[in-house]
Amino acid sequence: MAIQLSDKPLLEWAGDTLAIALFEDAVELTGELASLDEKFAGILKELIAEEEFTGKANSTVFTRVSANIPVRKIILVGLGKTEAFNIDTLRRAAAAVGKVGKKQKSKVIGLSFPLWNNDPTASSQAIAEGVQLALYQDNRFKSDPDDKGSQVETVELLGFAGQEAAINRANQIVSGVILARQLVAAPANSVTPITMAETAQQIAQDYGLQIEILEQEDCEKLGMGAFLGVALASDLPPKFIHLTYKPESTPKRKLAIVGKGLTFDSGGLNIKGAGSGIETMKIDMGGAAATLGAAKAIAQIKPNVEVHFISAVTENMISGKAMHPGDILTASNGKTIEVNNTDAEGRLTLADALVYTDKLGLDAIVDLATLTGANVIALGDDIAGLYTPDDALAGQLEQAASESGEKIWRMPLEEKYFEGLKSGIADMKNTGPRPGGSITAALFLKQFVKDTPWAHLDIAGPVWADKENGYNGPGATGYGVRLLVDWVLSE
């Protein structure tokens, strides 16, 4: 699908489908829209009245029109109340239009949308992101794709002439989101530690990034006992991925994104039982997928910031070689961990990844992981939990979340709760009591970052959508890519 920019006035545009956005408290047609309605023989007013269109956010109405009008179809989309209007309103409205257009077999859609904050650059980028993400469909594993012949071919943004750079930026970011979606959606017999490393190598080759893949023996030399303990039972070799983007000039900042990379999680010897959702555990590498997606986008955008993309990738499987409940592992910073639950493995892999990253001399680290069900219980499916002792870093991520529309909520790091992780025979256990489980998980990770400002994002909820949700789903969302890109660019 192509995104095009048009300098044609609304009154002069002609084509297949015209989409017009209206606010909930301003559905009465005035000015240019009143003139357009007159040109269209009153069809807009008639559509609003007959369909009882109120302009509620993301609501749509559709009609086909007669041959003597210069468009064949009309879509009205609601923007909600003006006081609630934000940049993500445009993304979601564009997504709603794209879905209606696809359903109605529109080939070309002209979008007439207002500006957010009088900013044509941010507005056009958001609209382009929304419609592309909504129209993406993953047919890789279908022998007979179910959307043949119903693709929108072109979307024209009316009144946004000159915003080519913004559209290019949107395309770059969307390419990263789609990569993350594809990695998360693919089954564990398709995406493995080996193929994840190959994907990272392809990104490095395509966009000129530096790459280092640490093999098992390399990780052994670095003392990564926590990561390798998880990897013991898998027949597939673990891969420790380190991609680096370096700008041509001296970087303003040096940052790292660290993603949890379990390409399948059986639970280990604490196996996930019936009803546990074990069949969905291909998604447990959602953090690593977002990390690689962000790498792909940032490598194209080329900001003046050095960024390291790191993931310890393996499977958590069952075999005679598997780590046992009660085993003690030694992480690469020397801390010992009593494994009281083999199904709390992600934090073990992240422990060694964070120790490694902390030694790089960076200005900030953000890790993201499908870490705990407790975070989903607390915040639901749409919101990631943010855990950090650093107020400045929290503010940066909250601003990036506001701009990207990928929601986060700062959670407490209550140090007292670390008491629940104390072990009688090791430095700590890998899980604590059930209450505050997402907090104790974050406190566990905190033990492996010594010198660098650090934040943890628990993305267990928003990494996957069970049903359609704006420009996401159903399926893998690619959550985290846009948030992380905005964070890096804000630097």
Swiss-Prot record:
Annotated Mn(2+) 2 binding sites: K260, D265, D284, E345
CDD domains reported in the protein's UniProt record: Peptidase_M17 (cd00433)
Catalytic activity: Release of an N-terminal amino acid, Xaa-|-Yaa-, in which Xaa is preferably Leu, but may be other amino acids including Pro although not Arg or Lys, and Yaa may be Pro. Amino acid amides and methyl esters are also readily hydrolyzed, but rates on arylamides are exceedingly low; Release of an N-terminal amino acid, preferentially leucine, but not glutamic or aspartic acids
The UniProt record lists the keyword Signal: no
Entry's Gene Ontology molecular function annotations: manganese ion binding; metalloaminopeptidase activity
UniProt cofactor(s): Mn(2+)
Function: Presumably involved in the processing and regular turnover of intracellular proteins. Catalyzes the removal of unsubstituted N-terminal amino acids from various peptides.
Protein family membership: Belongs to the peptidase M17 family.
Record's protein name: Probable cytosol aminopeptidase
Organism: Trichormus variabilis (strain ATCC 29413 / PCC 7937) (Anabaena variabilis)
